[in-house]
A protein has these predicted regions:
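Short, flexible loop segments at the rims of nucleotide/cofactor-binding pockets, characterized by
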Residues: 23-25, 87-93, 126-127
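ATP/nucleoside-binding phosphotransfer catalytic cores, i.e., glycine-rich phosphate-binding loops
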Residues: 102, 106-159
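A glycine-rich beta-strand to alpha-helix segment
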Residues: 35-61
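Solvent-exposed alpha-helices and their adjacent loops that cap or buttress functional pockets
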Residues: 9-10, 37-40, 65, 102-106, ...
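A short secondary-structure junction signal
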Residues: 28-31, 57-62, 68, 122-126
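Class I SAM-dependent methyltransferase SAM-binding "motif I" and its flanking Rossmann-like core
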Residues: 57-101
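Short, small-residue-biased leader/transition segments that mark boundaries at the very start
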Residues: 1-5
Length: 159
């Protein structure tokens, strides 16, 4: 992720922070990353995509919005969606560190990107449906500074 980001965005690497995916001690890395976020005064801008099931930041549908930074087992659909970034499906990690919903919601500003007709239904549910951890992105309705950047196709079910 870091290498892809650095090639695409004109922001100093010193101003970006990504969990160390090579750290084997997940509790240690989650704590380190949480403390880093706190020490820097929180997250200024949280950039998110939205998954077909409403997941954000590898936070799959569940029964809670309370998690902070944590390690997750990736679902088969998430592995499938991310294999385009790797040479083969076998190279895609099966676990990832992610900010939990609680951490995401503490960001000062959140920018959500959605594209394609296949995202239209979940965009409608997330931004105009009931707030539920079974559609994780729906919690963004409670944040005071969220911007959705989407193409016409992704917005087609809301107008």
């Amino acid at each position: 992720l870091g290498d892809v980001y650095k090639r695409q965005v004109n922001i100093s690497v010193d101003n970006t922070h990504i969990p160390n995916g090579m750290e084997q001690d997940s509790e240690k890395e989650c704590n380190r990353y949480s403390e880093l976020i706190k020490s820097l005064g929180g997250i200024d801008l949280q950039l998110l995509g939205i998954g077909h099931n409403g997941h954000i930041g590898f936070n799959e549908p569940s029964d809670s919005f309370e998690k902070q930074v944590h390690c997750v087992d990736l679902t088969e659909s998430t592995i499938e969606a991310n294999k385009r970034f790797f040479e083969s499906a076998e190279d895609v990690p099966r676990q990832a560190y992610t900010m939990g919903i609680k951490t995401i919601m503490q960001a000062k500003k959140i920018l959500v990107v959605a594209s394609g007709e296949d995202k239209a239904q979940i965009v409608k549910e997330a931004f105009f449906g009931h707030i539920t951890p079974y559609v994780p992105a729906s919690v963004l309705q409670l944040h005071n500074d969220v911007t959705l950047v989407a193409d016409e196709a992704a917005l087609s079910k809301i107008y």
